[in-house]
A protein has these predicted regions:
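Amphipathic alpha-helical assembly/interaction segments
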Residues: 1-117
Length: 117
């Protein structure tokens, strides 16, 4: 797939999977699962939306991808605040998550504009 949003989301998901090994503290397995699922959901939903084309369903999957990016950012911020993820690991992932969310948002805006014409 040649979408920048998908490429960056895929790279982010791989980094989150690797970074999740640094999580520590109580309920680390549950936290790791939530973080990884949210991260992997982003490129998966971009791909599904792209696969459905310029239509309402495509836009819906891009909306889910954008929401998953917001969820991932929240999990990363909570993990950092709770001391479960070191700031040196959390902050770059948060910055990349925000970038991916912005790219997905712009893609969604583009699809919605095409749908309205």
């Amino acid at each position: 797939m040649d979408l920048l949003a998908w490429k960056k989301a895929t790279a982010l998901a791989a980094s989150v999977v690797a970074g999740s090994r640094m999580l520590k503290g109580p309920a680390v397995t549950a936290t790791r699962s939530q973080v990884v699922r949210a991260a992997e959901s982003i490129p998966a939903n971009i791909a599904e939306g792209y696969g459905r084309g310029i239509c309402g369903d495509g836009a819906r999957f891009l909306t889910v991808a954008r929401a998953s990016a917001a969820e991932l950012e929240s999990h990363l911020r909570v993990a950092e605040a709770a001391g479960r993820l070191p700031p040196a690991a959390a902050r770059p992932l948060i910055a990349r998550t925000r970038e991916v969310r912005y790219l997905v948002h712009r893609l969604l805006v583009s699809v919605r504009l095409r749908l309205s014409h």
